[in-house]
A protein has these predicted regions:
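Conserved donor-binding/catalytic core segment of Leloir-type glycosyltransferases
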Residues: 211, 215, 220-236, 242-245, ...
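Short N-terminal targeting/anchoring amphipathic segment
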Residues: 77-84, 93-119, 133-137, 318
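A conserved catalytic-core segment of Leloir-type glycosyltransferases
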Residues: 26-29, 33-104, 274-278, 283-293
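Nucleotide-activated donor-binding/catalytic signature segment of Leloir-type glycosyltransferases, i.e.
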Residues: 220, 266-308
Length: 324
């Protein structure tokens, strides 16, 4: 089968991108052909369609998002621009399916969390109109995020996040999400937890590439690398990691955060930077040096995998308030 993955982003080392790669690897091993549709992509261009408007950080999507969250009424112009963008994205989805002769779509979180509302609406309409078989792989639902609680799009959330369609099968990553989906939407789903590939050996942590990580981050030989291997979002509870290191009262302890802020803005990051300064904790954010593969970037810098950082860490902190 020709299978198309659809999301806002397939790039870097965010959870959705990493988990999707695992699915794609298994499907390819079974003889299927895999293709990619997203707004930001680091996949092979030969098997990808990158449409910038599908990315949650596109200016038009930002304009829409600013006017639908934190309020309960939307002007007609907002509805018009949502529909206009959804129509365009639907046409690009049609082109994607036609170009690669796709038999099935796997929608990764784009029908789950409404960071790009027009994309979710476009996917829903496209699936309803074509009856193309599809899987919605749900990583974190909008009702799990406080910032989506007050909104001006209850109609769209009800119909598209996620939709109830006979040709759409749902997959959840844990039982709690599965139960909430059934309770709120009245649809059944399959449970497929996120897993590690234990059969693939890890890279040698003593090799020259991994050994360069500490000095390239500015760490001394006797510094203690404390790793926070998450995005900078409030539910990760990173302030507790900073407090912990402050209580250790050892200037050699450095908190290294592997990922960036993602789709939730910079307010939390600024708060953490201020807290770290007040607590005397050195904070190193290395998101621009993390990739899913080792390589040298266009600036001549080594790019490290998340496993490189794990292997160089002395301690890992993960004080999440809740997880998917």
């Amino acid at each position: 089968m020709n299978i198309g993955f659809v999301s806002t982003r397939f790039a870097g080392t965010d959870g959705v991108s990493l988990e999707t790669l695992k699915w794609a690897t298994v499907l390819e091993e079974q003889g299927h052909q895999v293709y990619w549709f997203s707004g930001l992509s680091d996949r092979d261009p030969e098997v990808s369609m990158c449409v910038p408007e599908a990315f949650f950080g596109h200016p038009e999507i930002d304009w829409i998002s600013e006017r639908i969250w934190g309020c309960t009424q939307r002007p007609a112009i907002v509805t018009e621009r949502i529909n206009e963008m959804a129509g365009y994205l639907k046409s690009m989805l049609k082109r994607f399916v036609s170009q690669f002769q796709l038999d099935c779509l796997v929608v990764e979180n784009a029908l789950t969390i409404p960071v790009n509302v027009p994309l979710g609406k476009a996917i829903t309409e496209f699936l309803a109109e074509t009856n193309l078989p599809a899987i919605a792989h749900h990583h974190d639902f909008y009702w799990e995020r406080q910032r989506f609680a007050v909104n001006a799009i209850p109609d769209i959330l009800d119909t598209s996040f996620p939709p109830r369609l006979p040709n759409l099968q749902h997959v959840c990553i844990n039982r709690q999400a599965q139960e909430q989906l059934s309770l709120r939407k009245g649809v059944s789903s399959t449970l497929v937890p996120n897993v590690f590939d234990f059969e693939t050996p890890l890279a040698d942590s003593t090799d020259d590439w991994a050994a360069n990580l500490r000095p390239e981050l500015g760490l001394a030989e006797d510094d203690i690398l404390i790793l926070q291997p998450t995005r900078i979002v409030p539910r990760k509870g990173i302030e507790h990691s900073i407090k912990l290191i402050s209580m250790m009262e050892d200037p050699r302890c450095k908190l290294v955060i592997s990922h960036s802020t993602g789709d939730e803005g910079y307010e939390y990051r600024h708060m953490l930077e201020k807290l770290a300064q007040d607590e005397g904790v050195e904070l190193i954010i290395m998101s621009d040096r993390i990739s899913d593969t080792r390589h040298v970037n266009r600036h001549g810098q080594r790019m490290f995998t998340l496993w490189d950082v794990y292997q160089q860490a002395d301690l890992v902190t993960y004080p999440s308030l809740y997880e998917g």
